[in-house]
Amino acid sequence: MGGDKLMPHVAGIRDDSREGSRISKRRGEIFREHHLPHLSAFPLVRDLVRQFITDGYTVVVASSAQSDELSQLLKIAGVSDLIAATASSSEASRSKPDPDIVQAALQRSGAPAEQAIMLGDTPYDVEAALRAGIAIVGVESGGWSAEDLRGAVEVHPGAAGIYGHYGESAFARLIRAGRLTSRIS
């Protein structure tokens, strides 16, 4: 859930109010100063993204993060050079679970929804993908369980789990079915 929805949901504060703007700005500062420097990539993320590309996927990232944070996160994950395009909350009027960011990423991929698969780690990702008409594979790396990710075509413990069982994954099945055009993360 993006900040535009989180503050009203949790604290009853509109993100576009004076107070909401100050809170959002400070949240970003705290994240960049205290948390971002300590983040590291999950195991096998780069290998998994390379596998997607080898198989012909166009990798597009759809994130509720601000564009400046997203570029830093992709560098930390070690995949910034492998990503064809991004769509962030900076470029959408509504964040997840609304489908705006996912639809923007899908448009950038050039793929129709039925030929794309999204990879997500929150219930908001699942809802956004389904509302955009895209199949989604869930990963439990976001702190959510398989039960929380209900609606995903399959759920894995993380990128390493997908990579380790790639041949049986929804990504490989799409390739075998001859329906491959793009993938959104």
Protein language model regions, located:
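Asp-based, Mg2+/Mn2+-dependent phosphohydrolase catalytic module
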Residues: 50-51, 67, 71-185
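Conserved phosphate-coupling serine/threonine residues in phosphotransfer and NTP-handling enzymes
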Residues: 63-65
